[in-house]
A protein has these predicted regions:
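Metal/cofactor-centered catalytic core regions of large enzymes
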Residues: 1-401
């Protein structure tokens, strides 16, 4: 009989404390996270996260798929930023293949990746504010998120699971009118950010619930593997887009927001400022978008255009072979990391020279950031645990995989 890991058990260390189950159905845990809390009255003594409720076996599934068939699976790792996962996986396989991606495809990837970051941060801000009691911000954020989802649907046909970035470039040229709609959104979005800040940043209830709450030092954040706004909220100036640039990010000008306090409010400020920087990158991409192809010149790897398939026998043959047999990737291994909305998302891909990956492992930013939660919550109130969970912005699909 297969060995089964027992459910984590926490025993009260003292007679005056008790054990409280929080989740996995609790709305503030943002998915199916279970927390075991040892509490003394309203004060939290210890926290033990219990994960695994959303395990889907995606990493193992990848081993049975052709390389191009893995792309739709990556959408479902972190379902709030599917294009970021598409990009990370595509970059890893492209490095193994030695593909050179056309500039237009790279700039489109950057623009859509930043729209994905904004989309994810809007979900975070709306739900985080709702957890603490600010319902209006939740409604405002989802108003703008709807605009972004419509842009995704326009360019890819899907609102969430887009599968738009492919190995070798992107799936399709954006349709007519797409860039105009992106520009319309980019022009008015900064004023929307001002609305969010007017409701929250100086709100005395918001500051009381976030300032000095769930503090984590830079040393602890680094030691526990934190990344993204959670790390930068503790004063560590590190962003992969700037410090290890990929996909033409070195061609764009942007600041990396950093706060030193390490509390819930600091992480909030970092993400709100990131909204401003991301929309600035989108505007730069619109202004400087290069012309040219959107796919690498690699007919044995990249699906041909549909128009060519109507007139060229070679294109039809290549399409048939890629779909039915996949494409072989030279033997080797590579680790590719990108800056997701939650931190360092990484893909470790091992090839044995066949058309299917030998191993695909996803490095989860959320799993590392979750390790900070017990230290954040020690000595705080139960209500502060809710604020702490929201401040690290976890997605359980990415953690459990």
């Amino acid at each position: 009989m297969a060995h089964m890991t027992p459910t984590p058990v926490m025993d009260a260390a003292q007679d005056r404390t008790m054990i409280l189950n929080m989740g996995p159905q609790h709305p503030s845990t943002h998915g199916v996270l279970r927390l075991l809390l040892e509490i003394d009255g309203e004060t939290v003594v210890r926290v033990m996260p219990d994960i695994g409720y959303l395990h889907t076996g995606i990493e193992k599934t990848c081993e049975a798929k052709f390389y191009q068939q893995v792309v739709p699976l990556t959408d479902r790792i972190d379902y709030l930023c599917p294009m970021t996962n598409n990009l990370c996986y595509a970059l890893a396989v492209e490095r193994l293949l030695g593909l050179e991606i056309p500039p237009r495809a790279q700039w489109l990837r950057v623009m859509l990746n930043e729209l994905t970051r904004i989309n994810s941060h809007l979900v975070w801000l709306g739900t985080h504010a709702l957890d603490i009691g600010a319902m209006t911000v939740f409604l405002y954020c989802f108003r703008e998120r709807e605009d972004i989802l419509r842009l995704f649907e326009m360019v890819s046909g899907q609102r969430m699971m887009t599968s738009y970035f492919r190995v070798g470039g992107i799936a399709l040229e954006p349709p007519l009118g797409f860039f105009e709609r992106v520009k319309h959104f980019a022009d008015r979005f900064p004023a929307r950010i001002d609305e969010y800040e007017n409701l929250l940043t100086s709100n005395p209830i918001w500051t009381m619930r976030t300032k000095g709450v769930a503090t984590i030092t830079a040393e602890d954040a680094i030691a526990l593997g934190a990344s993204g706004p959670t790390l930068r909220g503790s004063g560590v100036d590190w962003d992969l887009r700037r410090d290890m640039p990929y996909s033409s990010y070195d061609k764009f000008q942007f600041k990396v927001p950093v706060a030193k306090e390490g509390d819930v409010f600091a992480r909030y400020i970092c993400r709100v400022q990131e909204l401003r920087e991301s929309i600035g990158i989108v505007q730069q991409a619109l202004a400087g978008m290069p012309e040219g192809p959107i796919k690498a010149d690699a007919p044995k790897v990249v699906l041909p255009d549909r128009e060519k398939m109507k007139t060229q026998m070679e294109a039809l043959i290549y399409h048939f072979k890629i779909v039915t047999e996949g494409f072989a990737v030279p033997a080797g291994e590579v680790y590719q990391a990108v800056e997701s909305p939650r931190g360092e998302m990484g893909y470790y891909v091992v090839s044995d020279g066949t058309a299917k990956p030998y191993r695909v492992h996803m490095r989860s930013a959320c799993l590392a950031n979750l390790q900070l939660l017990p230290k954040m919550c020690e000595g705080r109130l139960i209500a502060d645990v809710v604020a702490a969970i929201g401040s690290i912005d976890i997605v359980l699909g990415e953690i459990d995989r």
